[in-house]
């Protein structure tokens, strides 16, 4: 019947895709060993209806924060391959799964915003989405994640379409009792100018207002 035919085609497609990837990697192990060790996941096979329509409407994620040198596998074909932490290629991969008018959100370490080591991922994100909203949170006295994670966090929200804008917040320091109200307190400030790949400052509304006043005064 049709269901069995579909399953057979899916199995054949998965096998041929695995064979192609195995050859591309020049892996000395057998195909079966490579599949067992790598556990390849083929998005277009697992979600055919999604990719017929161009990708996911919304992609939301919390990628792993792990130094590249500490993982025992390799990844290929990413513009962000040389980033120190694997959250960068995870951000890139997630973006590639999004449809042309889709929306995107990732929670990542604050290094995404300012570190030179992650300039490439900022360039990639800026080239893929038009509107960026980035909120930033300290780890003291409280943090979004448990203390063992030990990171200051940036929540990156983006969408495709519309004029290119970047909005950021100040670095929020907060107590645990504020957690349920934290997002209600967020204030974004639109960056007056920004360059693709450049660090995203976190001036906050008050400092931005002061800058604008100084600029206006000098223009008079």
Each model region followed by its residue ranges:
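Signature of N6-adenine DNA methyltransferases within the class I
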Residues: 42-220
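Basic, amphipathic N-terminal segments
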Residues: 1-40, 45, 52-58
């Amino acid at each position: 019947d049709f269901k069995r035919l579909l399953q057979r085609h899916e199995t054949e497609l998965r096998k041929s895709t695995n064979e192609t990837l195995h050859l591309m990697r020049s892996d000395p192990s057998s195909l079966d060993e490579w599949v067992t060790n790598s556990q390849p996941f083929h998005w277009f096979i697992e979600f055919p209806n999604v990719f017929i329509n161009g990708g996911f409407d919304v992609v939301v994620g919390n990628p792993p924060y792990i130094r590249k040198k500490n993982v025992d596998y390799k990844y290929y074909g990413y513009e962000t391959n040389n980033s120190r932490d694997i959250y960068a290629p995870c951000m890139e991969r997630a973006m590639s799964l999004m449809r042309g008018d889709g929306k995107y959100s990732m929670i990542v370490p604050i290094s995404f915003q300012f570190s030179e080591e992650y300039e490439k991922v900022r360039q990639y994100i800026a080239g893929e989405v038009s509107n960026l909203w980035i909120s930033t949170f300290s780890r003291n006295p409280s943090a979004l994640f448990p203390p063992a994670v030990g990171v200051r966090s940036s929540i990156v929200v983006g969408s495709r379409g519309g004029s290119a804008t970047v909005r950021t917040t100040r670095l929020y320091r907060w107590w645990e009792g504020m957690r349920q109200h934290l997002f209600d307190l967020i204030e974004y400030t639109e960056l007056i100018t920004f360059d693709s790949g450049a660090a995203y400052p976190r001036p906050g509304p008050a400092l931005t207002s002061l800058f604008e006043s100084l600029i206006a005064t000098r223009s008079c």
